[in-house]
């Protein structure tokens, strides 16, 4: 988890 990786950038809905 960096800054804008799949963890934070991926859509939840």
UniProtKB/Swiss-Prot annotation:
Keywords from UniProt, A to Z, are: Chloroplast, Membrane, Photosynthesis, Photosystem I, Plastid, Thylakoid
Stated membrane topology is: Peripheral membrane protein
Q: What is its main location?
A: plastid
- Top-level taxon of origin: Eukaryota
Q: What Gene Ontology biological process does one annotation of this record name?
A: photosynthesis
Q: Which GO CC terms are listed, alphabetically?
A: chloroplast thylakoid membrane; photosystem I
Q: Does the keyword Membrane apply?
A: yes
Where does it localize? Plastid, Chloroplast thylakoid membrane
As for what it does, the entry says: Stabilizes the interaction between PsaC and the PSI core, assists the docking of the ferredoxin to PSI and interacts with ferredoxin-NADP oxidoreductase.
Q: Which family does it belong to?
A: Belongs to the PsaE family.
Name of this chain's protein: Photosystem I reaction center subunit IV
Taxonomic source organism: Pisum sativum (Garden pea)
């Amino acid at each position: 988890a960096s800054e804008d990786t799949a963890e934070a950038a991926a859509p939840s809905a």
